[in-house]
């Protein structure tokens, strides 16, 4: 069950209206997870500084159980997420940051329990 959070200082009118939907589909493909298990949040107009500059930028946080735990996995994921973000947001790679956070099943709650017991 991947959780993807995208923060950007771009105003809403400069972000494609369907970005959340596209990011959901891209995440499902990149992480080899069913689309219906992917959770996406997009926040626009956020006050942000990346690399000492408040020029247009974005940060993407990807957390998931089992698929973001190694450098090798994340290197592959990073290349694909960077391609998606540069193509869909019009940002240069030096204005994009990614963070990968591996989760354990006991850290994700669903249906009044945690994933360990589902």
Curated annotation (Swiss-Prot):
GO terms for cellular component: cytoplasm. InterPro entries: Macrophage_inhib_fac (IPR001398), Tautomerase/MIF_sf (IPR014347). GO terms for molecular function: D-dopachrome decarboxylase activity. Its EC number is 4.1.1.84. It catalyses: D-dopachrome + H(+) = 5,6-dihydroxyindole + CO2. It is found in: Cytoplasm. Keywords: Acetylation, Cytoplasm, Lyase, Melanin biosynthesis. GO terms for biological process: melanin biosynthetic process. The modification N-acetylproline is found at residue 2. It comes from the Eukaryota. Belongs to the MIF family. Tautomerization of D-dopachrome with decarboxylation to give 5,6-dihydroxyindole (DHI). Homotrimer. This is D-dopachrome decarboxylase. It comes from Xenopus tropicalis. The lineage of its organism: Eukaryota, Metazoa, Chordata, Craniata, Vertebrata.
């Amino acid at each position: 069950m991947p959780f993807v959070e995208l923060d950007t200082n771009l105003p809403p009118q400069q972000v494609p209206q369907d970005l959340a939907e596209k990011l959901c589909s891209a995440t499902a493909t990149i992480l080899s997870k069913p689309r219906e298990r992917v959770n996406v949040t997009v926040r626009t107009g956020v006050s942000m500084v990346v690399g000492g500059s408040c020029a247009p930028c974005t940060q993407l946080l990807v957390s998931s159980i089992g698929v973001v735990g190694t450098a090798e996995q994340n290197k592959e994921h990073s290349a694909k997420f960077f391609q998606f973000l540069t193509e869909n947001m019009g940002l240069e790679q030096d204005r994009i940051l990614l963070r990968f956070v591996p989760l354990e099943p006991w850290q994700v709650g669903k249906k009044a329990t945690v994933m360990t017991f589902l």
